[in-house]
């Protein structure tokens, strides 16, 4: 027989179920700790530990003066392939983070993306991705993206200087790099993006990341590595993103490949 869960866990599970079924809606406050103690739900320490567990699981936010409140919004959709649709940024002005907001039915302002641009020495990972010696000069465009006042993620793109020198990509003005963003800048410079490789993994955040992204205690981040190439294989961007784990739902919609069919087509040519 499995051991009985501690009382704080039982209390946390009960509130979690009530949140999921809508008994407590987004923005609604859970009972005060002292009220639950008086109602016989456990000691102050028990109730506080239950609420901290709910916060760690991303269901509530705890703050002085506001108590324990159910998180207001569902995670943002982070589109996989669709966010890079050329028609969005080449022919329009829907850069990747805006495409995510549109898909999520959420509002946005261009200045919710801020950035700093600097010329730095390439780390081993950056140098390998861009095909440069370690320590070579590269441009780093570091962005912090927010939804309203809440940070959602950081994204730092690295470029060879000869690809972006004198372009809007090295302009630190808040918001995307002009109409269509960085991919449109590369397109106009003769570096049309053709294919990408993305790698994602979850990890524990650093103390600095937890503070910058305003993470709940125990919340993990999802790190993204994106390598962007032209049709001839030239790497024109290597990017590292750090996303608040509970603020995104990663969404992919793609045609299922059939390598046997592709090989047959190649042989018939």
Curated annotation (Swiss-Prot):
InterPro entries: Bact_HTH_transcr_reg (IPR050679), Chorismate_lyase_/UTRA_dom_sf (IPR028978), Tscrpt_reg_HTH_GntR (IPR000524), UTRA (IPR011663), WH-like_DNA-bd_sf (IPR036388), WH_DNA-bd_sf (IPR036390). Residues 5-73 form the HTH gntR-type domain. SUPFAM superfamilies: Chorismate lyase-like, Winged helix' DNA-binding domain. The keyword DNA-binding applies. Gene3D superfamilies: Chorismate lyase-like, Winged helix-like DNA-binding domain superfamily/Winged helix DNA-binding domain. Residues 33-52 bind DNA. It comes from the Bacteria. GO terms for biological process: negative regulation of DNA-templated transcription. GO terms for molecular function: DNA binding; DNA-binding transcription factor activity. Keywords: DNA-binding, Transcription, Transcription regulation. The keyword Hydrolase does not apply. The imp locus inhibits the extrachromosomal maintenance of the Streptomyces plasmid SLP1. This is Uncharacterized HTH-type transcriptional regulator SCO4628. It comes from Streptomyces coelicolor (strain ATCC BAA-471 / A3(2) / M145). The lineage of its organism: Bacteria, Bacillati, Actinomycetota, Actinomycetes, Kitasatosporales.
